Amino acid sequence: MFSWLKGRRSKDTLKDRLELVLAYDRAQIPPGKVDALRNDLLEVVKRYFPAGSSNVEVEQRGDQVVLMASIALDEGIENPGRRER
């Protein structure tokens, strides 16, 4: 009945988005640069491993801006060494 109460509150979502925008601004990252980086990282990882989706985040930690990448590797990796092209 009140399923909208179970989800994330819009003020929390807005706060997270604002923090992300501020971190990008402080790091002087132009729009679209993180998306391009995400695509490039995923392309490189796929050369060596079967990989799925990726997530790249920028955070402000004190005086530093931190870039974090999380890339899901597909199951069934037989040989983690370099694949032949």
From Swiss-Prot:
The keyword Cell cycle applies. InterPro entries: MinE, MinE_sf. One of its GO terms (biological process) is regulation of division septum assembly. SUPFAM superfamilies: Cell division protein MinE topological specificity domain. The keyword Cell cycle applies. It comes from the Bacteria. Prevents the cell division inhibition by proteins MinC and MinD at internal division sites while permitting inhibition at polar sites. This ensures cell division at the proper site by restricting the formation of a division septum at the midpoint of the long axis of the cell. This is Cell division topological specificity factor. The gene is minE.
